[in-house]
Design a protein with these regions (language model features):
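N-terminal secretory signal peptides that target proteins for export/translocation
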Residues: 1-28
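N-terminal leader/targeting segments and the immediately adjacent pre-domain N-terminus
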Residues: 5, 41-47, 53
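Bacterial N-terminal signal peptides
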Residues: 27, 31-43
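N-terminal targeting leaders of exported, membrane, and organelle-targeted proteins
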Residues: 12-16, 33, 45-47
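Cell wall/extracellular polymer interaction/catalysis modules
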Residues: 48-201, 209-249
Length: 249
């Protein structure tokens, strides 16, 4: 039932999950009109359910970041990309590197698999990254939605290839060799001494101890979403918002 019907019949929202779901549906319906409203309404229930689920599994994550990540993921899936994805990792780069700012969720099993530290690029900033880039050689973090590919063993050990799907944000990820890998500088002890984690050349590097299980959980067709300044538009599935260049599209 819609919000007006619920108000007229005196129904109440009993749980946090219900309140989040209804708030999200209401906010999304105000963004679209006409034919777009009909199409969006058909997809809203499942999308709102996933937003509510993630909010329950990862209560420390901000709701707007969850909405953004799920919206970007659903946009990609509506274009036939990652339609079989079961797992989603969300990184919030507005949070200091000294804090855990990466969540890996199994949407199929409805479980939080990891809540972890993650590094940003050395040219992006100190503790909280301020600069982001899609340029080769920038050594800055790229934001937006990524589709995971195969694993390989490289100079940083066991690593995961990433396709950048967000036009203007991360489409050069493969050319930049932006991958997920473990790194000894991703260590809370380092952060305590230096006031920040060690930094990468733009890769979302994680702790060595959890790199392999995290990579194995995310490899081959799942999603990673990196939130930061200016990414709010990525939840809106507009024409040209998705780049499939690195996928051969």
């Amino acid at each position: 039932e819609n919000l007006n019907t619920m108000k007229q019949t005196g129904m109440t929202v009993a749980t946090k999950s219900d309140r989040i779901l209804l708030s999200y549906v209401s906010s999304m319906l105000t963004r679209v009109t006409g034919v777009l409203a009909v199409a969006a309404a058909l997809a809203l229930p499942a999308q709102a359910d996933e937003v509510a689920l993630i909010s329950q599994l990862a209560p420390s994550m901000r709701l707007n970041v969850i909405e953004e990540a799920v919206g970007a993921m659903k946009c990609a899936q509506s274009r036939g990309v990652g339609v079989n994805a079961q797992r989603l990792a969300i990184i919030d780069y507005t949070i200091p590197s000294r804090q855990k700012r990466m969540w890996v969720l199994d949407l199929e099993a409805e479980k939080l698999l990891f809540e972890e530290h993650v590094a940003h690029g050395k040219k992006s900033g100190h503790d909280i990254p301020k600069l982001f880039s899609n340029r080769v050689g920038s050594h800055q973090t790229s934001l937006g939605l990524f589709l995971t590919d195969a694993t390989y063993h490289g100079s940083n050990g066991y690593s995961l290839k990433l396709h950048g799907l967000s036009k203007g944000f991360n489409g050069a990820a493969m050319r930049r060799l932006i991958v997920m890998h473990g790194a000894p500088y991703v260590d809370p002890g380092v952060a305590a001494r230096a006031g920040r984690l060690g930094r990468s050349w733009g890769c979302p590097a994680v702790r060595v101890d959890i790199a392999r299980p995290m990579i194995d959980a995310l490899k081959e067709g799942n999603f990673i979403y990196s939130h930061g300044p200016g990414t709010s538009s990525l939840s809106q599935c507009g024409a040209g918002s998705l780049t499939l260049a690195s996928l051969g599209g």
